[in-house]
Swiss-Prot record:
Broad EC category: hydrolase
NCBIfam families: PRK00346.1-4, surE
Role of this protein: Nucleotidase that shows phosphatase activity on nucleoside 5'-monophosphates.
Compartments in which it is found: Cytoplasm
Single Gene Ontology MF annotation: 5'-nucleotidase activity
SUPFAM superfamilies associated with the record: SurE-like
GO-annotated cellular components: cytoplasm
Entries under Pfam families matching the protein: SurE
EC number from the UniProt entry: 3.1.3.5
Organism: Rhodopseudomonas palustris (strain TIE-1)
Binding locations of a divalent metal cation: D8, D9, S40, N93
Official protein name in the record: 5'-nucleotidase SurE
Length: 255
C-alpha cells in the first residue's frame, strides 16, 4: 500500500514525524509531501496566483511552498504520477480539529483534497491541554491510529467521505476507547479578537479562541464530548454539504 502523508503545520513539525511513524506501521511505501511553512488555518485554499516551489529534503520527503491542498495535488499528480497513492494521511495536527475547526483546518483540507482525487483519506489530530501545549502527547496518536486506520480501510471508506480522527489529551493507556461521533458545535463566542500595540503605539490584532467553559459542555455524541471524556473521536465527514432537509422546504417556498 502506497501512503501519501501531508499536514498543515509544516515539513519540520513533530506531528508530521508522528504521522510518518503511523504510516510506516501500516506500509513500507510511505511518501511525505508537506508545506515548507506553517499553513495552519488556511482551509482548502489553492495557490493560483503564485508558482509552487518544490524541494526534496530527504528520500521520499518533499517540501512545497504552498498549502496542504497544493501538497496533495503535487504528491498524487506529479511526484507519484507513475503510481498513485492508495491512502492519504493528513496530520498529525498539533491540536484538535473538531466542531467548527473543520471548516478552517488545513489538516482537514489535505484529507478532503485526497477524497476529491478519489483516494481514501484520513485527517489526524492530537488534542492538547494548557499543561501539554508545548509538548502534545504524540504517543497517543502514534499508539492508537494504526489499528483504527487498518479497521476502517478494511471496512471500506465511501467515496466523497473523509475520516476525521481526533485523539484525546491523555497518555495512550488512559484512552477509554474509540467512538464514532458527529461534528459538534461550540458557543458562537469561542472566537475573539486580541488588540495589541507595537513599539510605535500602532495597534495590531490576533484572532484567538476561548476555551470551553463548564457551562458550555458539549452535546453527547459529538466529537467535542468524546475528547472531553478521553475517547478517540472518529467522525465521517461528507464532501457534499447540501442541506437536504432545508432544500426540500426551500423548494416548496420557491415553487
Amino acid at each position: 500500500m502506497r501512503i501519501l502523508c501531508t499536514n498543515d503545520d509544516g515539513i519540520h513539525a513533530p506531528g508530521l514525524k508522528t504521522v510518518e511513524q503511523i504510516a510506516r506501521a501500516i506500509s513500507d511505501d510511505v511518501w511525505v509531501v508537506a508545506p515548507e511553512l506553517d499553513q495552519s488555518g488556511v482551509s482548502h485554499s489553492l495557490s493560483l496566483n503564485d508558482p509552487l516551489r518544490l524541494r526534496e529534503v530527504g528520500p521520499r520527503h518533499f517540501a512545497v511552498r504552498g498549502t496542504p491542498t497544493d501538497c496533495v495535488i503535487m504528491g498524487s499528480r506529479f511526484i507519484l504520477k507513475d503510481k498513485a497513492p492508495d491512502l492519504v494521511l493528513s496530520g498529525v495536527n498539533r491540536g484538535r480539529n473538531v466542531a467548527e475547526d473543520v471548516v478552517y483546518s488545513g489538516t482537514i483540507a489535505g484529507a478532503l483534497e485526497g477524497t476529491i482525487l478519489g483516494l481514501p483519506s484520513f485527517a489526524l489530530s492530537q488534542e492538547f491541554t494548557i499543561e501539554t501545549r508545548n509538548a502534545p502527547l504524540w504517543e497517543t496518536a502514534r499508539t492508537h491510529a494504526p489499528d483504527i486506520i487498518r479497521k476502517v480501510m478494511a471496512a471500506g471508506v465511501p467515496k466523497n467521505t473523509v475520516v476525521n480522527i481526533n485523539f484525546p489529551a491523555c497518555t495512550p493507556d488512559k484512552v477509554k476507547g474509540v467512538v464514532v461521533t458527529r461534528q459538534g458545535k461550540r458557543n458562537p463566542g469561542f472566537l475573539r479578537i486580541d488588540e495589541r500595540h507595537d513599539g510605535r503605539g500602532n495597534p495590531y490584532y490576533w484572532i484567538g479562541f476561548e476555551r470551553i467553559k463548564v457551562e458550555d459542555m458539549p452535546a453527547e455524541g459529538t466529537d467535542l464530548a468524546a475528547l472531553a471524556a478521553n475517547f478517540v473521536s472518529v467522525t465521517p465527514l461528507k464532501l457534499d454539504r447540501t442541506d437536504e432537509t432545508f432544500s426540500a422546504a426551500l423548494a416548496n417556498t420557491l415553487a
